[in-house]
């Protein structure tokens, strides 16, 4: 079992939903990079449950303890170990159904792989709880990317059948303005159209009151990536971003730019025409989401991820008792989200940051962290 993502810049995660703690080790950061613990806390707060009928009643403080690799607000150049304690667990909720395989969960696949030795409490290592470690590690990289002029943000494109305005894929200036709007918003859903927030909340609460759940779509934009980042084929920009995107539990689909819409276009419609803008090469449209041949072309990278409904629902379901080897009904206990889409937005942002950070480090070494305003001018 390997719990590490990344080559040049890597994050290893550990822990289980009801264990003593979860956390990670971030390796590959240069020395002297500022680490804003207030920013990390703000990112964690966006992921944190509120117990408000829109998310799980399990509310954790999610304080991030930096155990190594950071002194006086700057990286030391050694591995950054971080830990988040689990304090609000109720493992007894799972005792009565321990032998029943929950539909949509990893109970059966974990049993098939680990032969009963896995920690099944609250989903164990497969729980969405572990995404707190992704956010904590990703937030450190996200801050470094921001100083290098690279912006990453995510909004709720669709939730419970209700849609937000899409990102302006073909207008980089309009997209930058949309990103600024999202980053200026405080608490609340990550939306471009604030008028759809209450209808979304109403739909989520309605599903929860019925013992059910809903899913949605997240849309992520990456601005400021220079041309020439990424590798053809196996380590393409799409490959590594997708790798991390699918590391977020409940993500079941991804598309870049026009994505599956390409199937209905002609080549003359799908190609992004090149043109000069001052000394820079840009494209007139951005169907390919700033990526050609697996390598960035300098235009914004935009992708969408499909998030399935939370599998933990309170309606009675059909399953099997894998110890008794017989069919059985299942009524799930415990505390669960009627929808994880709003909380998953920051998770997807931080997951993308880890992928982009690894890509940037593979291309520029640690120069982009050490000289965030100068590495592009150095012609590396």
Model-found features: residue ranges?
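Generic N-terminal targeting/processing segments that precede catalytic cores or assembly contacts
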Residues: 1-380
């Amino acid at each position: 079992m390997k719990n590490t993502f990344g080559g040049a810049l890597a994050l290893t995660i550990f822990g289980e939903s009801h264990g003593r703690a979860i956390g990670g080790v971030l390796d590959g950061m240069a020395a002297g990079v500022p680490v804003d613990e207030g920013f990390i806390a703000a990112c964690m707060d966006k992921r944190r449950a509120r117990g408000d009928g829109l998310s799980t009643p399990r509310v954790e403080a999610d304080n991030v303890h930096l155990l190594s690799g950071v002194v006086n607000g700057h990286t030391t150049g050694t591995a950054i170990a971080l830990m988040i304690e689990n304090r609000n667990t109720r493992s007894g909720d799972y005792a009565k159904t321990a032998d029943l395989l929950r539909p949509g969960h990893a109970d059966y696949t974990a049993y098939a792989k680990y032969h009963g030795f896995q920690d099944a409490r609250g989903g164990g290592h497969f729980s969405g709880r572990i995404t707190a470690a992704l956010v904590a590690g990703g937030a450190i990289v996200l801050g470094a990317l921001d100083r290098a002029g690279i912006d990453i943000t995510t909004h709720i494109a669709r939730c419970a059948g209700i849609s937000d305005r899409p990102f302006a894929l073909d207008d980089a200036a309009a997209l930058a303005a949309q990103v600024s709007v999202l980053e200026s918003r405080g608490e609340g859903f990550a939306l471009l159209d604030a008028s759809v927030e209450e209808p979304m909340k109403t739909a989520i609460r309605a599903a929860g009151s019925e013992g059910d759940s809903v899913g949605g779509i997240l849309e992520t934009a990456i601005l400021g990536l220079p041309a020439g980042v990424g590798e053809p084929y196996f380590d393409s920009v799409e490959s590594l971003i997708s790798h991390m995107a699918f590391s977020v539990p409940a993500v079941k689909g991804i598309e870049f730019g026009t994505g599956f819409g390409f199937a209905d276009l002609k080549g003359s419609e799908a190609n992004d025409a090149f043109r000069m803008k001052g000394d820079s090469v840009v494209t007139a449209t951005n169907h390919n989401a700033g990526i050609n041949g697996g390598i960035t072309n300098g235009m914004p990278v935009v992708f969408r991820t499909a998030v399935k409904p939370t599998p933990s629902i309170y309606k009675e379901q059909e399953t099997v008792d894998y110890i008794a080897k017989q069919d059985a009904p299942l009524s799930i206990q415990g505390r669960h989200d009627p929808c994880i889409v709003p909380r998953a937005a920051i998770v997807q942002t931080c997951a993308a940051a880890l992928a982009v950070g690894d890509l940037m480090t593979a291309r520029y070494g640690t120069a982009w962290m050490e000289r965030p305003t100068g590495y592009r001018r150095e012609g590396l």
